Amino acid sequence: MEESLLITNGPVRSFYNELIENLNSCSQFKISVAFITYGGLQVLLETLKALETRDIHGEILTTTYKEMTSPQVLERLSKFKNIHLKIYVPPTQNDGFHAKGYLFHKTSLESEKWTVIIGSSNITGRALKTNVEWNVLQNENCGEQQEPGVFTKSVLDEFETLWQSPWAKEYSDEFLISYRDYLAKVKRHQKQESKLYFHTTVLQTKIPRP
């Protein structure tokens, strides 16, 4: 049985409420999201700490695209023992990463199901609670063979493709240092109107010709 719902940020209920409820009720989770700000992470910290205590494991894939996800966020997420963190580094300046998908696996004595949320919300304070956002939630029960349905399987397959991509980098201290150095270069070059592109192995500076 499938059930689809539209999630918006309203006066009574918000995307934040749905996210917290699904995190609290899942047996595992997978999140692919372009931007995670520290303000967005802050409102989720207590829930993430509770999941760590309960040994509920998850995978989070975010990105360096647009430099919206800060080194501080990556460092804090890396401290959770139950979270496997990867960072997608687009291969060229013309490639972006703007996906927002939240997957929750839920099991009970009676059933097994996936809840998938796909839409416009990043993990930022405003996106979680106040922005005009549209997100579609779909609950999909697993069949007799305990396999996900067609829709959920397609989302899981796409997540796995991105997760295993050569552009999805494991978090490490070396990665964090490289990213911080890059952001410092961006700040120094902003006044010169230069365009910088972050890569895990090189820093390329492209300054417009006069």
Question: What role is predicted for each listed range?
Answer:
Residues 1-210:
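PLD/PLD-like phosphodiesterase catalytic module centered on the HKD motif
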